[in-house]
Each structure stands twice: as structure tokens, then as C-alpha cells.
């Protein structure tokens, strides 16, 4: 026990504050913030506390008491805050408040004199421009003035509110919102004015349009007409006038001048007196034309066009590309003139029909977006009126249809340009290549035009219905038929338009157009562009490899047989005579004609040029000559049988004069009357127009009928002579053989050309095969009839064969046959055959 007390005493001595007791008896080890009670105890000072009230050991401490902590026994009062201090506390006024007494601190509520501080009064610039300071209890706020708002970055900075763009204005729709700094105004727009009794500026302003045109406030030139618009006005050219160069129309400063025709001149390099006179007359109309007489000018222009179409004069003799170029220029110029003159006419429909049935239909009315239907006897059209108006010309919109029926001369032999997609479709359908297209125009040429000329690609398609016109020569006539036109084999009904072509002057095309249907004598089309349209019947020339093979092989065989006939008639002496001469020239004509037919019958390119006309003329001459020589054979039979005792027939000179002279005369007269009849777009043969085919068909029919009469007479005479006891029985048998041969020859050649006359018809595929086969058999038949079946010719062939085989056999053969052959030669006339 004594040891423990000693150890505690030693520890006490080492602790801080441990001192020996003073003389008064107070402990010297009391902790900080405490005071001595006696020599062995201490007590914490006010505002501090320890674990026990009396501190008896130096290890205890006195900690500060937080009088302000909750629950607080201190009450500072309102608008104040309690602040704890070391061993005590203070009451201070809250931020935004200050004591009235001036003391910074106080101890209890009774000493509280805190009151609100007016920061707005102390610092008027607390809120920046366009802001107002508002004092609050203990603080302040900034409020923006009306028409302003705080910026997001700083709640003390205000900026202007644009009521016009934010939609916070109640302005009437007839006014214009004008933003001001912190406010806005509702003011009338330019060209508007407040309605009577309404102010101009406040938010209750209501405005109305000012009619500058009726009030005289406009500044339009005298060449224009004032048009009031909502809030403004425009100056538009008078009807029949156009803006001066470089000045836009429908502006306030627009200045206009009277419209004039564009210069009409023949295309470069085209020399035609008829065309020059026509263009001169049109130019005279243009110089004399006035806006007030637009209707009369339209009628006069159409009459001039009709005169040119009905009496083309030397235009008809121009080459097809030149005529097509003239057609292109004529149609384009007519559209421009009608477009210009139509704008001088009063609003509403307009129709004019010339004595030649050329018809013009116009529709003139204000802009809109409704569907409009207009039509005439030859065509009808349905379109959206917004398409007719366009964007360039603000005036009344114009749509027109100009139907010209008599354009056969200018558009003759025009070709159809098949685009690659159409070509591929046709070749897939017919499983063969397309060599060309034959066209037949079924309708008038209808030029469609609008107010503007930007019609290559329309916003919406236009519907057309074109009437079919009666046709007798492959082109459109004037009177509509009562029945529909049905396409035949390899034919198609097309809605085509005339397209400019630098090489051919112009051609038909179908891009952008499709046929929707055909009934009641008309065809309906839909097109996405405008031009001059027509309904065409296209006959596709599909390459027939079988027919081509038959033609080439068969004609080659025929030419070979004809060549054998020619050599036989020239070299076999026993058969020489007038009849052999006839057969020789007949074969020569057929040989030359077949050679030309094989080499040049097809017209490549579709244009009828000099080569094609020459081939057609030579074929015409050769085949006519062949029939003339065949008629001479009938004449020889007439002299032999009917007039057997009255001479020897015609001499060789007369035979050649008739056989070659008569065909030459026929061809010459035909060419002089209608030279364009030679050549067609597809084949180099006689054209069907104006009955030109009868220049061949007529003589052939006459020759066949005459020969038939001669042969009937010959057979009748032979029958009479055979019924008698006639000493010339041998000669009569020979005549009978000659007659049978001639009849067979006439039958073959006649039947061949009966089919051949129709070979070039569009639906003559079967007839073409028949004609080709018979034509290929002509040479072989003539060789069989006049050579192989002729006994004398066969004997000559044997001699030639023996001569080629060897001389001994030929000597033996001639010794055994010389006697009989000599007797036969003496017994017969030189002109007789030996069948």
C-alpha cells in the first residue's frame, strides 16, 4: 500500500501545473479556463464545463459551452443571430438588419434593437440599367422594367424583349410589329393605312390596303397598266406590249413597247421563190399589225399558211431534209406569233376556222390552279391552269391549239426516231431486229402552246385527244371517219411529236408521250412536254431472215438459170430465129431486173434520194420491157397461126424498137408527170401516192389481157385446123406446141406479178413469200421450158458434152445424126421450136 502511494506522488510531480501548495492553501494544478477552490480542488470558469463540477485531478479539462446550440437557452430576439464566443456568446443583427442603438452586439432579447436596412436607398446602383431595386426584409431584389428581361448570365442585368419575334404582341394581322427598346408598336405596312377611326401605332391599330391605282398614287409608265396588289401595286405591260430589253415586267419601273413579229426568213441555204414570197407576206403583216387588230392578224397569218400548204410550188421539189427543216421553222414561228397575238385578245375563249379547215382555239384567263378543258373539232386538251401560267409572265395565262390538216408536202417521208428503250422492247416482242419504220399520219398536226415557251418538262402532264382523219393516200385528209383505226400485224398506234433535228431538219419522236386508249375515232395521249403532235400508225420493218435467205438463194439460182438461157439462145444455132430473139431479150430483161432487185431494192436510211429513185426507175423499165417482149411473143404466135399464110412476122429491128422503146416511153412520161413517184422510204419501188403504181400496173394488165386474147384466138384457130384434113398437120403440131409454151410462160410471169403488185403492202407477208418463191422460179422455169424441153437444144448440149469428153465420140455421134438433123433443119422454119 505504501508503494502505490509513493508511485502516484511521483507521477503528480511530473505533471504540468503541479506545484507545491502555496502558503494560502490553493491548488496550483487547475486546468485552463478553471479557478482554484482549495488546495485539492478546482472549478471551471463560467461559460465552460467539465466532466464533474469539481475538478480533483489535473487530467480533467474545461470545455467551452455553446450557448447558441439548439436547444438554446439564449433568446436574442427577432432579426438577430446568436454567435458563440470563448466562454460566452453575443447576439448580433442578421444580415440586412442593423441595431438602432448603434451597439454591435447584445446579450438578450431585451437589448435587441435590430431593424431592416434599406439597401436600395443605401446603394441606388445595385440594379443595373433597365432594372429597379426593390427592398425586402433583410435583403433586396432587382426587377426589370416592362419590355425587358434578365439575361441568363446575370440576374441583375436586363435586356430588351423583342415582342415582335417572341409572339408577345397583340398586333392585328393587317399591321406590322415594330420593336422599340422596352416596347413595340403596331404600325401599318407600306401600302396600307389605318382604317377610319383607328390610330397608327398602338396595339389596337387595324389597317387596310391602299389602292394606289385608283387613288393616283402610283408611278406607272404610260405604256403599262397599274394593278393593285395587297400592300403595293405593279406596272404591267398593256395587252399586246412587251417589256423593253433588260427591263422586267410587273415592276414599278416597268417600261413597255409594242410587240412585233420575229423576222421570218427561209432557212439558211434554202432557195425557194414560193417560200420567200410567203415570208415576205408574213413580214408585211407584222409591220402593219396593231394590238387592236390582233384577231384580224391571226386570221391573215392562218390564211397565208393555208395558201402555202395548198400550193407549195417549188417547195415540193426540195429534198426531204430541207422540207422537214421548213416544217420545223414554220411550226415554231406559228407558235410564237399565236402566243404574242393571243395576249392582245380579250379574256375568254377564242376560235377561228379557216376555209381550209385549219383551226385555232385559244383560252385566255387569269392565273389559277384548276383543271381546264378546251377543245375543237380535231383535238381536245385537259391541263392544270397553273401549268399554263408559268412563272415568267404575270399577266393572264394563255393556252392554244393550232390544228393544221394539210401538211402532207412538208412532212412527207418523215422518219420516226426510236429511242434505245423502245427499240429494245420491239426487238424483244418480235424476236428480231427492227430495220425501219413506215409511218402513216392519222390526224392533223396539232401545235400546242402556252403563255410561256418553257414547256420541255412540265410540272404535271397534259391529256390530249386527237381525232382521226380520213386518209386515202397515206396522209391525213380532212373528214373524220366513222370507224376506229385498228393496228394490224407489226403495227402500233403512236402519239408522236415533231422534234427539231440538225441532220434531217426534223423527225417524229415519242419520248415523254404515251397512248392511253383509242375509241370513237380518236386517240387519247398523255405527254409531259409540249410540241406539235400527231397520231401515227407505225408499221415496223422487222427483219425476216427466212425471207431474206429465200430471196438471196432463190434469185441467185434464177440469175444462174437466166444466164444459161441467154448463153443457149446466143450459141445454139438450130433454134435461131425471131422467137428465139424474143426469148433472148426477155431473159436479158429479167436478168438485169433481178440483179438490180437483189442489189438495190432496200432503201437504207428511209430517205428517198437519187440512188433510190434511179433503182426504182430501172426496175420499172426492166420489168415493163420483160412484159413487152412477152407481148411480142404473143404477136409472133398471131402471125404464125392466125396469119400463117401471110408473111413471116416482125423483123428484129421492129422487135427491138417495140420491146425497148415502148417501156422507155412509159417510164419517161411517168417520170415527167410525177418524178417523186419513184422510191419509197422502205423500198426503192413505185410509190402508191396519186395512183402512180398504175404506170406499171396499167401496161402490165393491158399486156396480159392482150396476150390472153391472142392465145384464146390461137387455140380456137388451131382447133379449127385440127378438125380439118390439113396437109400442113406437122406445122400445126409445132404451132400447138409453141402456143402451149407461150401460155405456160404467160401464166408463170403473170401470176408472179399479180402477187408482186402487192408485195409492198404493210400486211402482205404471205404475198411476199409467194412472190419471192415464184420470182425465184422464173429463171428455172424459163430454162426448163425453152432449153431442157427443147429437143434441138438437148442435141446441142449432147454435142457440146461429147466435144468436151473427146473428139472420137463426137465424130461418131455427128455421123449417125447428121442425116436426120439436116432433114429436120430443112423441114422447119428458122423460127420454129423443136419440142
From Swiss-Prot:
Residues 22-63, 64-115, 116-159, 160-208, 209-257 form the EGF-like domain. Residues 814-835 are annotated as: Disordered. The keyword DNA damage does not apply. The record marks 530-531 as: Cleavage. It is found in: Cell membrane. Residues 573-581, 643-653, 713-739, 790-835 are cytoplasmic. Residues 349-543 form the GAIN-B domain. Glycans are attached at residues 33, 38, 108, 203, 371, 406, 413, 453, 520. GO terms for biological process: adenylate cyclase-activating G protein-coupled receptor signaling pathway; cell adhesion; cell surface receptor signaling pathway; cell-cell signaling; G protein-coupled receptor signaling pathway; immune response; inflammatory response. It is a multi-pass membrane protein. Broadly expressed, found on most hematopoietic cells, including activated lymphocytes, monocytes, macrophages, dendritic cells, and granulocytes. Expressed also abundantly by smooth muscle cells. Expressed in thyroid, colorectal, gastric, esophageal and pancreatic carcinomas too. Expression are increased under inflammatory conditions in the CNS of multiple sclerosis and in synovial tissue of patients with rheumatoid arthritis. Increased expression of CD97 in the synovium is accompanied by detectable levels of soluble CD97 in the synovial fluid. Induction: Rapid up-regulation during lymphocyte activation. The chain crosses the membrane at residues 553-572, 582-601, 621-642, 654-674, 692-712, 740-760, 767-789. It comes from the Eukaryota. The modification Phosphoserine is found at residues 815, 818, 831, 833. Residues 1-20 form the signal peptide. Receptor potentially involved in both adhesion and signaling processes early after leukocyte activation. Plays an essential role in leukocyte migration. Belongs to the G-protein coupled receptor 2 family. LN-TM7 subfamily. The first two EGF domains mediate the interaction with DAF. A third tandemly arranged EGF domain is necessary for the structural integrity of the binding region. Binding to chondroitin sulfate is mediated by the fourth EGF domain. Forms a heterodimer, consisting of a large extracellular region (alpha subunit) non-covalently linked to a seven-transmembrane moiety (beta subunit). Interacts with complement decay-accelerating factor (DAF). The largest isoform (isoform 1) interacts with chondroitin sulfate. This is Adhesion G protein-coupled receptor E5. It comes from Homo sapiens. The lineage of its organism: Eukaryota, Metazoa, Chordata, Craniata, Vertebrata.
